[in-house]
Amino acid sequence: GIDFTGNTYPGAQVPFGMVQLSPDNGLPGWDRISGYFYPDTTIAGFSHTHLSGTGAGDLYDISFMPVTRPYKEAPAPLGVYSTFSHNDEMASAGYYRVLLKDYNINVELTATERCGIQRYTFPKAEASVFLNLKKAMNWDFTLDSYIEVVDSMTIRGYRFSQGWSPLQHVYFETHFSKPFMACHMDTTSIVTKDRGRIGTAYIARFDFNTEKDEEILVTTGISGVSMEGAGKNLRAEVSKDDFDYYQAQAAKTWN
């Protein structure tokens, strides 16, 4: 299972789904092949692709992390993170929930076949959501990436990576249920190989002012073909900001 070397993850997906939306502890190692190891006490992001029960660590694509400012950050690979307790964690078919203790943010995850739906419940705070396309663990590393701000509620881009499986292409489009006030883009992380530049690892921070118990939904469609395909998947499968509806649909699919 999720303990020792069972190498499974606790997050949300539907049967045969392209999306496996799950927390990542943020640390490398044989025990964390799936991104999650039960004895760990940190979470450093919620990414949309995972392998279950394998002996090789890969994927972890399109990683989001909600925080309040100031936030906690450690040297890579952990980066921006929070502590958590299993007492504040719950999972069922197609659903996952955890409290990020350092920010008092409740995170809930569910999924459709090609989309991930996240619901963040914030305290009254200066809040942010990170999107880290540089985030990598174990065999996986970023070859190139891109983030485009379409408008104050929509972004899209891609992450190309290499690891256990070569030349993985994951395209995405993400919709926020609330406009972000500001976007801070870090494009200074250059990817090199054989002393030559091969790409850029994008990291973005989207800022919000939140009231107590305010909910923000972050919905992401993915595609292996194009950003346009990811957007079509998002609009086809998640047509409204209604987390409870999609959670119920995911549970129904499993049943």
Please give the residue ranges for each predicted region:
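Accessory carbohydrate-recognition regions in carbohydrate-active enzymes
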Residues: 1-255
